[in-house]
UniProtKB/Swiss-Prot annotation:
This is tRNA N6-adenosine threonylcarbamoyltransferase. GO terms for biological process: tRNA threonylcarbamoyladenosine modification. Binds 1 Fe(2+) ion per subunit. Coiled coil: none annotated. It is found in: Cytoplasm.
Length: 346
């Protein structure tokens, strides 16, 4: 079965075609970074309007690249939540309208399930069970994954997500949007040892996270440097960026390793936008060696929000017998707030 997937939960418009037997056939992605840069963050109304402009051309592009027509499509999938309500409604409306016009089933997918399963698009493909570290701008969670739809929450952030800590710290340093990648690039030129920043909850003994204290510590350093009309010099900014990144990465890696030890598992899947961070990947590669454990990441091109992960998650649900393939009446809703535990498979 060929599934056409749509992602529009925030500031990326993604469309993809996935075959349940052959995997990813084609995907196309448009990012709104340039549009939101002048505002320093995502403007929900602008995001929704841009999704409307982009989704049909991207759909045509994917079908052309895959050598398909709508007659070849057996089901449609879309991100049903969580995310920005207006943005979610664009992808959901297009998917449901297309499904209605072709008498096809429409499958609503949890955004985080898309991220969680996206490393399975790469080779070698991790086998179940595994521990998943989901790290993005809006979420930081550790999950035990025993199969598609079989997820156990092990720990999560109690305040800011890791990606949010990157972005907010970058903003405090006067870096551009999106802050996380800008901070990571600047950190390459810095000396992390110059600033002693906290590692919140590093030794808490549990698998939860907290990054608000780190953000406050960064603010304190910036205020100290700019007191009495001073400014944060270029090298100071690079050093502070390096120290901030090192603190976030150390906590993420330590908690992930603790999760592996507590569960007895030896496979770690890392997904979400922060999963593209080079220091995190390198740090985990070193830290996992003594455990004889392996880390799995999605391709860099699929770390951000994308349609491929949504179509693929739908395909995995179809193969696991967890998708309702009846056509239905195409009445639908979206869920801006949605706990991943709510989609457990029995």
């Amino acid at each position: 079965m060929i599934i056409l997937g749509f992602e529009s939960s925030c500031d990326e418009t993604g469309v993809a075609a996935v075959c349940t037997e052959r995997g990813l056939l084609a995907h196309a992605l448009h990012t709104q970074i340039a549009m939101h840069q002048e505002y320093g963050g995502v403007v929900p109304e602008l995001a929704s309007r841009d999704h409307i402009r982009r989704v049909v051309p991207l759909t045509r592009q994917v079908l052309a690249e895959a050598g398909l027509t709508l007659a070849d499509v057996g089901a449609v999938a879309y991100t049903a939540g969580p995310g920005l309500a207006g943005a979610l409604l664009v992808g959901a409306s297009v998917a449901q309208a297309l499904a209605w016009s072709r008498a096809l089933p429409a499958i609503g997918i949890h955004h985080l399930e898309g991220h969680l399963l996206s490393p399975l698009l790469a080779e070698p493909r991790p086998e179940f069970p595994f521990v998943a570290l989901l790290v993005s701008g809006g979420h930081t969670q550790l999950m035990r994954v025993d199969g598609v739809g079989r997820y156990e929450l092990l720990g999560e952030t109690l305040d800011d997500a890791a990606g949010e800590a990157f972005d907010k710290s970058a903003k405090l340093m006067g870096l551009g949007y999106p802050g996380g990648p800008a901070l990571a690039r600047l950190a390459e030129q810095g000396d992390a040892s110059r600033y002693d920043l906290p590692r919140p909850m590093l030794h808490s003994g549990d698998l939860d996270f907290s990054f608000s204290g780190l953000k406050t510590a960064v603010l304190t350093r910036v205020k100290a440097a700019t007191r009495d009309g001073g400014e944060l010099g270029e090298q100071d900014r690079a050093d502070l960026a390096a120290a901030t990144q090192a603190a976030i990465v150390e906590v993420l890696a330590a908690k992930a390793i603790r999760a592996l030890k507590q569960t007895g598992l030896r496979r770690l899947v890392v997904a979400g936008g922060v999963g593209a961070n080079a220091l995190l990947r390198a740090h985990l590669a070193r830290a996992l060696k003594p455990l004889r454990a392996e880390a799995y990441f999605p391709p860099l091109s699929l770390c951000t929000d994308n349609g491929a992960m949504i179509a693929f998650a739908a395909a995995e649900r179809v193969k696991a017998g967890l998708a309702d393939l009846r056509e239905g009446d195409h009445a639908f809703t979206v869920r801006p707030r949605w706990d991943l535990a709510d989609i457990q498979a029995g």
